[in-house]
Amino acid sequence: MKSVGLITEYNPFHNGHQYHINQSKKLTNADVTIAIMSGNFVMRGEPAIYNKFTRAKMALSTADLVIELPATASLSSGDHFAELAVKVADYMSVDTIAFGSENNNIKTLKQLAHSINEIEQSESFSQKVKEGKSYPRIISELLEHHEALASPNNILGISYLKAIAKHAKNINAISIKRENAQHHDSLIQHHKFASGTSIRTSIISQDDHWHHVVPKDIQHLYVTPHITLNQIFPYLKYQIIAMTTESLKNIYTVTEGFENRLKSYINEATDFHHFVKSLKTKRYTYTHIQRLLMNVLLNIKPTDVTRNIHAVKVLAMNDRGRQYLKHLKTVFPERQYITNINKSNAHYFTNEIKATHIYNAISGQQQTDFNTPVIQQYR
């Protein structure tokens, strides 16, 4: 069976995602579409607006298989996110990875990926790091502000291509042009497509604009409970106050004395966004800081970080997805394709289980990795 993989967050699922899946399948002539999706915390450095089970159900309206991306991937840099996602795709024997981009020129993106790999090994790169500049700024400067680097999806696409070249040369890659909405659009401005940011804003504001930009047959899923950063902050504040400076120093992505900034500013902070602004330095982007804070919330240490894939958690599958999974188990009998978590296999998913428990503690929801069987229908 020919497969196409999509590296996703679906925060939440919308018409643009549906278009991406359908185009990916069409352009690759794939028999099965596999969505590799972030769990309850996403790359923006925040909790997903809906839990992973609801979002997997949304995705199953169009995709055939939904696989959970390791939690630490979503709370890492773009390169580590891409590396683990590509390794999951390889574990799933994906033939082609299809990603969305504003550029849509795969040749240009591959050339940029090669150039960035060379830049990262240069003395100029090391010098600019010592000057305290952020990674995105350094790359932009050394590539003479290449216009393709102005859009986040192009940047992430380049990370996928770098990871494929390094870890899974057997996987092909294609780019699909994003339609209409831009990644950071804060308001819904189109009758069919909108950014995830604008849809989340609409949902949180409790208006009905999001109705126009999500698939009609799954709109009932968008009235389920959702979670925001405002709900997270009291728990985060408690965690930072309760932890020692030394303990904060040992949290994943906390470096160069940042634990002292956390301690210095937490008592005066009144909300999440105020706190993040107070922590900002020229070395770190806002997104990096937010991911760091989620690592503090989840108490993720460097030793917890996944580097290789030893098992994957199947969140959702339809009949075609089930058939593909059966095929994989025949071809790779030694691999762990887990559809239901229990005591015998829970050790593979320690971070994901903990993230779900903390997400539930804050949101008041009850679905866990143990009481929620693999999703097989979305209606």
Swiss-Prot record:
<dbReference type="GO" id="GO:0000049">
    <property type="term" value="F:tRNA binding"/>
</dbReference>
<keyword id="KW-0067">ATP-binding</keyword>
<comment type="function">
    <text>Catalyzes the formation of N(4)-acetylcytidine (ac(4)C) at the wobble position of elongator tRNA(Met), using acetate and ATP as substrates. First activates an acetate ion to form acetyladenylate (Ac-AMP) and then transfers the acetyl group to tRNA to form ac(4)C34.</text>
</comment>
<dbReference type="GO" id="GO:0006400">
    <property type="term" value="P:tRNA modification"/>
</dbReference>
<dbReference type="GO" id="GO:0005524">
    <property type="term" value="F:ATP binding"/>
</dbReference>
<dbReference type="InterPro" id="IPR008513">
    <property type="entry name" value="tRNA(Met)_cyd_acetate_ligase"/>
</dbReference>
<keyword id="KW-0820">tRNA-binding</keyword>
<comment type="similarity">
    <text>Belongs to the TmcAL family.</text>
</comment>
<feature type="binding site">
    <location>
        <position position="153"/>
    </location>
    <ligand>
        <name>ATP</name>
    </ligand>
</feature>
<feature type="binding site">
    <location>
        <begin position="7"/>
        <end position="20"/>
    </location>
    <ligand>
        <name>ATP</name>
    </ligand>
</feature>
<feature type="binding site">
    <location>
        <position position="100"/>
    </location>
    <ligand>
        <name>ATP</name>
    </ligand>
</feature>
<dbReference type="Pfam" id="PF05636">
    <property type="entry name" value="HIGH_NTase1"/>
</dbReference>
<feature type="binding site">
    <location>
        <position position="178"/>
    </location>
    <ligand>
        <name>ATP</name>
    </ligand>
</feature>
<protein>
    <recommendedName>
        <fullName>tRNA(Met) cytidine acetate ligase</fullName>
        <ecNumber>6.3.4.-</ecNumber>
    </recommendedName>
</protein>
<keyword id="KW-0694">RNA-binding</keyword>
<dbReference type="GO" id="GO:0016879">
    <property type="term" value="F:ligase activity, forming carbon-nitrogen bonds"/>
</dbReference>
<keyword id="KW-0547">Nucleotide-binding</keyword>
<keyword id="KW-0963">Cytoplasm</keyword>
<keyword id="KW-0819">tRNA processing</keyword>
<dbReference type="GO" id="GO:0005737">
    <property type="term" value="C:cytoplasm"/>
</dbReference>
<keyword id="KW-0436">Ligase</keyword>
<dbReference type="InterPro" id="IPR014729">
    <property type="entry name" value="Rossmann-like_a/b/a_fold"/>
</dbReference>
